[in-house]
């Protein structure tokens, strides 16, 4: 297991109370040895005007996952902040849920890189994101 902080899924989800994460309906669903996953509904909260998943909602899911994964790689007195987010949208989603899968690309002392892939309910890749974070403290 790569994580330096040991949180349960319930504890991870509690960090979202009264935030944009909760408003978008993002829920952490899996904490594995080197992976963090979350689901987000595709509904009126996450649609763009044409009834499709908003690209910004996919980006918010990605940054949520990468930032929390980055935080779990820090020690007491440290935090992470996002420095760069790149998102490539591959296919539209109009309903159901999407699942984000976050894994590390680079884990340095001062910066981290995370890949977050967003899948639809059929397991098709909808969006590929890369998040860079800086470790502070």
UniProtKB/Swiss-Prot annotation:
One of its GO terms (biological process) is enterobactin biosynthetic process. One of its GO terms (molecular function) is 1,4-dihydroxy-2-naphthoyl-CoA thioesterase activity. GO terms for cellular component: cytosol. Its EC number is 3.1.2.-. The keyword Coiled coil does not apply. The active site is at 63 (nucleophile or proton acceptor). It comes from the Bacteria. Pathway: Siderophore biosynthesis; enterobactin biosynthesis. Pfam families: 4HBT (PF03061). It is found in: Cytoplasm. Keywords: Cytoplasm, Hydrolase. InterPro entries: HotDog_dom_sf, PAAI_dom, Thioesterase_EntH, Thioestr_dom. Homotetramer. Dimer of dimers. Interacts specifically with the aryl carrier protein (ArCP) domain of EntB. NCBIfam families: PRK10254.1, unchar_dom_1. Belongs to the thioesterase PaaI family. Required for optimal enterobactin synthesis. Acts as a proofreading enzyme that prevents EntB misacylation by hydrolyzing the thioester bound existing between EntB and wrongly charged molecules. This is Proofreading thioesterase EntH.
């Amino acid at each position: 297991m790569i994580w330096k902080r040991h949180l349960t899924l319930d504890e991870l989800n509690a960090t979202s109370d009264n935030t944009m994460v909760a408003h978008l309906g993002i829920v952490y669903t899996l904490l594995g040895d080197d992976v963090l996953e979350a689901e987000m509904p595709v509904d009126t909260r996450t649609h763009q005007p044409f009834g499709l998943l908003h690209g910004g909602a996919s980006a918010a899911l990605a940054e949520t996952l990468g930032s929390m994964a980055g935080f779990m790689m820090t020690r007491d007195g440290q935090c992470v902040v996002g420095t760069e987010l790149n998102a490539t949208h591959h296919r539209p989603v109009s309903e159901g849920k999407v699942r984000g899968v976050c894994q590390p690309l680079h884990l340095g002392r001062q910066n981290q890189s995370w890949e977050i892939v967003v899948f639809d309910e059929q397991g098709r890749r909808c969006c590929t994101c890369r998040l860079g974070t800086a470790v502070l403290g």
